[in-house]
């Protein structure tokens, strides 16, 4: 399975404390209509940390059902417990996901050997395509390029990585060490074009929740050799990307989607609504982009 182009790390719409299935299905449908290249439910942006196990399964199940094979679904299945990650991966496989996204274990800060053994054990237990997810700013641990290459060499089920270290040297080394068949996706909306320029294949994006056509257009333009168009889209996306991270993700992106009329704004504690000045700033950016 090829995971490339722009994949949306899709939000989980909530209403009265429950998953808003109607809004979620409508959002998925709009994403596909706008030309997105894949969907990633139950990631950080989908508030996976505060979903119950039952809700986690429902979010993935609904996404797969609504997509109906039109674009790849890469289901979030990570945990800081290897055993729990195996269970989440098994569910994703049984539900019909095209692959699973596995974040590096967080909080318990495993060594590089521990990271290697974690991914190896999951793949041995549940055989399916995996994309690893390196985001040291959230997990407290960085997976080095050497460890990524070791996993790629020994664990064929691991077909790529979502790289959100914001370290272009490390990303370049991963591409160098792992070769062109290893799918390296940006996990940072600000570094999509630089990552593509050194051999990456796309992005798992937050900002594409609100502008799927623009982010998929950037990736398509680059792949087609239209570097001028890709650069133009990169700069058009930059103000929106900054706005998506003016507070903790996914607070701004869910607020933006609410302003656009695509969902009711509801977050789960400890996430709280935006500060008034930041909300005003966000609305201004969306207005300039013609989104509200």
From Swiss-Prot:
Catalytic site positions: 133, 162
Record's signal peptide: none
InterPro entries (UniProt xref): Aldolase_TIM, DapA, DapA-like, Schiff_base-form_aldolases_AS, Schiff_base-form_aldolases_CS
Gene Ontology molecular function terms on file: 4-hydroxy-tetrahydrodipicolinate synthase activity
PROSITE patterns, per database record: DHDPS_1, DHDPS_2
Keyword Cytoplasm (UniProt): yes
Primary role: Catalyzes the condensation of (S)-aspartate-beta-semialdehyde [(S)-ASA] and pyruvate to 4-hydroxy-tetrahydrodipicolinate (HTPA).
Protein name: 4-hydroxy-tetrahydrodipicolinate synthase
Gene field: dapA
């Amino acid at each position: 399975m090829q995971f490339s182009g722009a994949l949306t790390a899709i939000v989980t719409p909530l209403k009265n404390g429950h998953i808003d299935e109607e809004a979620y299905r409508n959002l998925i449908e709009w994403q596909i209509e706008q030309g997105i290249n894949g969907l990633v439910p139950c990631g950080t942006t989908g508030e996976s940390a505060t979903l119950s196990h039952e809700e986690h399964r429902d979010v993935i199940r609904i996404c797969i059902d609504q997509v109906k094979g039109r674009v790849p679904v890469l289901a979030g299945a990570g945990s800081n417990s290897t055993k729990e990650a195996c269970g989440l991966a098994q569910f994703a496989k049984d539900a019909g996901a095209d692959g699973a996204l596995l974040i590096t274990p967080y909080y318990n800060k495993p060594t590089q050997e521990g990271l290697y053994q974690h991914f190896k054990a999951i793949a041995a237990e549940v055989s399916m395509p995996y994309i690893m997810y390196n985001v040291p700013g959230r997990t407290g641990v960085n997976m080095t390029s050497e460890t990524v290459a070791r996993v790629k060499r020994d664990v064929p089920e691991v077909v790529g990585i979502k790289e959100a270290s914001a370290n272009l040297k490390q990303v370049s080394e991963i591409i160098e060490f792992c070769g062109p068949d290893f799918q390296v996706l940006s996990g940072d909306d600000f570094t999509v074009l630089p990552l593509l320029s050194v051999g990456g294949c796309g992005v798992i994006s937050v900002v594409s929740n609100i502008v799927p056509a623009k982010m998929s257009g950037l990736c398509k333009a680059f792949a087609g050799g239209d570097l001028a168009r890709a650069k133009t889209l990169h700069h058009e996306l930059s103000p929106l990307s900054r706005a998506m991270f003016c507070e903790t993700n996914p607070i701004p992106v869910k607020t933006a989607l609410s302003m656009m009329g695509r969902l009711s704004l509801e977050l789960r504690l400890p996430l709280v609504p935006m500060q008034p000045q930041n909300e005003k700033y966000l609305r201004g950016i969306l207005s300039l982009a013609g989104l509200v």
